[in-house]
Amino acid sequence: MCGRYVITKPVEKTVKIVKSSTTVKDDENFNAHPSQALPIIKSYSNGKTLELVKWGIVPSWAKQKDFRPLINARIETIDEKVSFKKLIKTTRCVVVMDGFYAVSYTH
């Protein structure tokens, strides 16, 4: 499972393509991770918008206040898991990125 991704293209270009009025910090990010506000493209009935969101979801059934957001889903079981079953049909977005990777620590 991947826990990091890379943004190297200027987000400003994405803003122009999407025709969004959102202003975002336009830095390269070679270590985009779940605790950061990161750019996505979302579609609404009146058009597309660029939004900054934190990566991950907290399922509606999670009761603990310190529940860690889910950041990955397996495509093989996404339509079976309670956490994603409804969301996959109704709530989608485009994640602005150039690539993704899994962090590997060596001793």
Which residues make up each language-model segment?
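Short linear sequence motif anchored by a di-proline
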Residues: 1-105
